[in-house]
């Protein structure tokens, strides 16, 4: 698919921010000739804010849409709802299919929200840093502080947000390019495989968490490599 001149709108994951999702996708998309937009998350209205950003951008023409984790969920749902406005979907680290229930990403978001409410930002951040790789600790320390004090609400809303199920993904008109880590316990590669198996035109490329930690652009690179197969 030729992306030259296309506009790509990329949505951040829960607790993450527009800075990270931009770095994850901008380099590969710019190399392909696309314009990249990464709207800042609005933690008090995370899902609604993302959908409004997509609707606003689509007024100028069809979009490449995508994101990471809950950003991928919102993007693929928007593409299902607006089949005439979505050129392609770039889904990084999809978190679940259908209802979140006990999906690891949903459980992690609920747990973190509870810690933040109980212990406050400083203590919860210190606990996160103690149990995270350095690269992730740096990213989340910044993005959590930016979204405080509304971060717990955003996490809880995301953890309860339903993704399209397999039957709904079967109706996706746009090509779906999925990128996932083979060793991510929070975003299992099995979810990515479910999305790819369900959508009519879909492909998956993978990487490791070590590769992601070294360069977030592996997400965008993997998505564009998957898209090139379609």
Show where each model-derived region lies.
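Conserved alpha/beta-hydrolase "acid-adjacent" motif
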Residues: 185-191
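Conserved HGGG/HGGXW glycine-rich cap/lid loop of the alpha/beta-hydrolase fold
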Residues: 1-45
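Gly/Ala-rich beta-loop-alpha elbow adjacent to hydrolase catalytic centers
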Residues: 67-75
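Conserved acidic catalytic loop of the alpha/beta-hydrolase fold
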Residues: 30, 42, 46-63
């Amino acid at each position: 698919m030729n992306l030259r001149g296309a506009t790509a709108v990329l949505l951040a994951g829960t607790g993450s921010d527009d800075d990270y999702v931009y770095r994850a996708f901008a380099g590969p998309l710019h190399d392909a000739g696309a314009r990249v937009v990464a709207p800042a998350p609005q933690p008090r209205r995370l899902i609604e804010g993302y959908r409004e950003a997509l609707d606003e951008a689509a007024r100028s023409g069809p979009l490449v849409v995508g994101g990471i984790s809950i950003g991928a969920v919102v993007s693929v749902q928007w593409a299902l709802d607006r089949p005439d406005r979505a050129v392609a979907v770039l889904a990084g680290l999809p978190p679940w299919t259908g209802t979140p229930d006990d999906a690891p990403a949903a459980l992690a978001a609920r747990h973190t929200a509870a810690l933040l409410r109980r212990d406050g930002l400083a203590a919860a951040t210190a606990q996160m840093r103690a149990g995270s790789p350095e690269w992730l600790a740096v990213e989340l320390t910044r993005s959590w502080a930016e979204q405080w004090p509304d971060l717990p609400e955003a996490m809880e809303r995301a953890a309860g947000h339903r993704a399209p199920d397999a039957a709904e993904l079967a109706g996706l008109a746009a090509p779906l390019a999925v990128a996932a880590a083979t060793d991510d316990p929070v975003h299992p590669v099995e979810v990515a495989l479910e999305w790819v198996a369900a959508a009519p035109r879909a492909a998956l490329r993978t990487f490791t968490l070590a590769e992601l930690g070294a360069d977030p652009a592996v997400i965008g690179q993997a998505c564009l490599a998957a898209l090139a197969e379609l």
